[in-house]
Amino acid sequence: MEKNPITLLILNGKSAGNEELREAIGELRKDGYTLHVRVTWEYGDAKRYVEEAIQLSADNVIAAGGDGTVNEVAAALAVQPEAVRPCLGIIPLGTANDFATSCQIPMEMHNALTLAIKGRATDIDIAKVNDEHYFINMATGGFATRITTETPAKMKAALGSASYVLHALFRMDMLQAERCEIHGPDFHWAGDTLVIAVGNGRQAGGGQELCPEALVNDGLLELSVLSAKELLPNMLQAWFTGSENQNMISATLPWLEITAPDDMTFNLDGEPLTAKRFRIEVLPAAIRCRLPPQCPLLE
């Protein structure tokens, strides 16, 4: 008789009262599935729970939260030995859920939980930044980063992903270029930029598709740079509607380095990182993740 998998679900504390998820967990437990639930309250909790999952010989670790929770769990999994590394499952419970949305993970709790436990396991890439930071979805710099990091929590709770767009319109006074230089294999660019996006996934900032051709299992990252030469109206149209912009600089690279004369801040799946130099490289097939068969981010 095939044993049911052991699953440890890591739940962001902000969503601890989600009744729909509680009911879904109860239903799967009645069906014989072993589910352990742990709740995070501060940074570092997810890493400890991943280590606990390995001690339990868990088959799955589920990140139940937003993009930041998924990031923290994925990063903790990536540094574990492959032989004992559980498979990642995702339940979208955040403000934007950009990675889950672009992967077409169900928003309904029972379907998402079932996928996270029983779905097809697929090798996927993640990205490493400056040898010690990670992202599974996207790193963004420039105006987009300032908007997503400074949007008030109450606005995000009330309006969801629309809060980022609204806050951007309120804060056009922040719109200023940052000078930097970017190079990678057969690629070099230098100048003033308003937005930089390095995507393993396709969208960030509450649904803005900044890297529309990115795939999570091709061993590459998609780079998109919006030059400060671009006029504001066209920039807004391209950013908010996803329309094609001929002044957007794009490349597909296994690694790249970004250097700047002044500090820049990049948002790594919601976590800010400030430096003058960033080395970003893809880690091919770094973890296994349970994704729907129709996931558009797979080759």
Swiss-Prot record:
GO CC terms in record: cytoplasm; plasma membrane
Residues annotated as domain DAGKc: 2-133
Compartment(s): Cytoplasm
Binding, ATP: T40, G66, D67, G68, T69, V70, N71, E72, T95
Pfam families: DAGK_cat (PF00781), YegS_C (PF19279)
PROSITE patterns for the chain: DAGK
Job description of the protein: Probably phosphorylates lipids; the in vivo substrate is unknown.
The protein, known as: Probable lipid kinase YegS-like
